[in-house]
Amino acid sequence: MKSDLLLLVITVVVALIFDFLNGFHDAANSIATVVSTRVLSPKLAVLWAAVFNFVAAFFLGTAVAKTIGRGMIRIESVSQYVVIAGLLGAIVWDLLTWWWRLPTSSSHALIGGYAGAAIMRAGFGVIIPEGWHKTLIFIVVAPIMGLFLGLVLMVSVFWLLRNKAPRRIDVWFRRLQLLSAAAYSLGHGGNDAQKTMGIVASALYGAKYLTSAELAGNWGHFHWPIILAAHAAIALGTYFGGWRIVHTMGSRITKLKPVGGFCAETAGAITLFSTALAGIPVSTTHTITGAIVGVGATTRLSAVRWGVARRIVWAWILTIPASAIVAALLFWAFRLVKPDA
């Protein structure tokens, strides 16, 4: 019993480390545009984003956590070793792509890792098709939503302010971009911290501290300490952030002015709020990249650096299978040591 409790503690700690790395790796997306447009210095930008990552705990519910915890993998096939192997697979992939300066999705690395470990334990029957359908569909839909909204917002702003002096527009949108960056960071914290909450719920089930009925219920067991811990971890990760990726997101895809940064962040925030409330675990990276591309394309298609965007897309395509393979191998290694893992 003591060993089971120790393993649960280790699993929760690894989950919070993943959450921290999610902030370190992904939350750069929240500040890339506001840094690129020089509205905030990098140090102030990370503090701004971190605060709103944490504040999201009080606004966006637990719908995404429920999807991760019981909507994608048949929970009866989950053990603590599945959860920890899935987390480690995602962490390994996140660190590799951080080193390679690729803004891939920590969310999809987590989903891929969790699935890979579960499949290695119990076969492909553990997959819940309905949960995967909406997640896989939104791998495509989220960046398209971001692109479309960014394009529409940018065109609308150009039309509404067509007779205003460019310098005055720049002053206005420097102020407004503080709000859009805050909104995007709120959406990021609300969507991504919940994924860690869902994984913690799976670990509690695997350790038999939670029944399947409780997992399927109203999640009254998700007390505030767990919610606050998940949001605090991602906020700290943001604060200590991933500057290698900020450079790629904020300046190498397209050059942005404050009006473009505002439109991209607002488009991303709208997408993240709507999907978080609907319980769809989307990628913040996909979303903001689509929005930046949409904004850049309003000037001219050549303003978008398609070579960089293409490299990023390839990293997206590889994320779920790569993290799944790493996690499956880790679970296989666990089984060599503990056959009933």
Model-based region annotation:
Residues M1-A341:
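Multi-pass alpha-helical transmembrane bundle typical of ion/small-solute transporters
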